[in-house]
Amino acid sequence: MFRKILGTLVVFPIIRVLFRIQDSLRAGPMRDAGLMLAGEKSIYQARQHRALISTMEYVEKHMPHVASVKCKPELLAKAFSLADVSGDRIICEFGVFKGESINHVAKLTNQTLYGFDSFEGLAEEWGDTWKKGDFLVPKLPKVRDNVTLVKGWFNETLPPFLKEHTGKVGFLHVDCDLYSSCKTIFELMESRLVPGTVIVFDEFFNYPQWEDGEFKAFQEFLAKTKLSCEFIGYNRNGEQAAVILK
């Protein structure tokens, strides 16, 4: 009798969970079943979960055979190895913050890298989490000898820079978070981004509303210029993706 009672106590909760999954599958996608099963009540976590699912679907559709990497530094190194940075081609990063990424790439070459950042934080709110001024850097980060920092807002610093540096872009790392900032980059550098240019996006996908950020600015750039791209890698544990323009 005791064993029967114990078995009933164990089985009933499992049955209840199975019914909850079944009901969820009837009501919506599998992702909702996962949330219901976990008892998730955080709106942020729920939105992140949905972003993960939409990112997975994008990867399966647009880059099913593209090799992924386990971390951002690995993607930067892989992308840089495929970039043509010979002659007067420009190597640049937009969104330096504390200098970790640009220093990582700088170790891979003796050429000069240009890092653009206002160092005053976000120019506007980003999503429902980050506020204007977040990511403020009180003083310029320490960078390697082959890195030149260009301090200021992109729309103010890029025009004079491009007048002085006439080469095409060989390698571009976009880490500016905001759609507006990314749009500014693509508008001002449009003629310098050519077939063969390698671009690494730091926030391409896998976060809530990723379709409205760097991803959107890039799609608009492709539509305007009639260029295409080939994915050359992505971070399977993060938000980064790398492309080469065609």
Residue ranges with predicted function:
Residues M56-Y58, A77, V85-K246:
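S-adenosylmethionine/decaboxylated-SAM
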Residues L18-E93, I102:
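Class I SAM-dependent methyltransferase Rossmann-like catalytic core
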Residues F2-V17, I21:
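Alpha-helical hydrophobic membrane-insertion segments
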Residues F12, G28, V137-L140:
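Intrinsic-disorder/low-complexity coil detector
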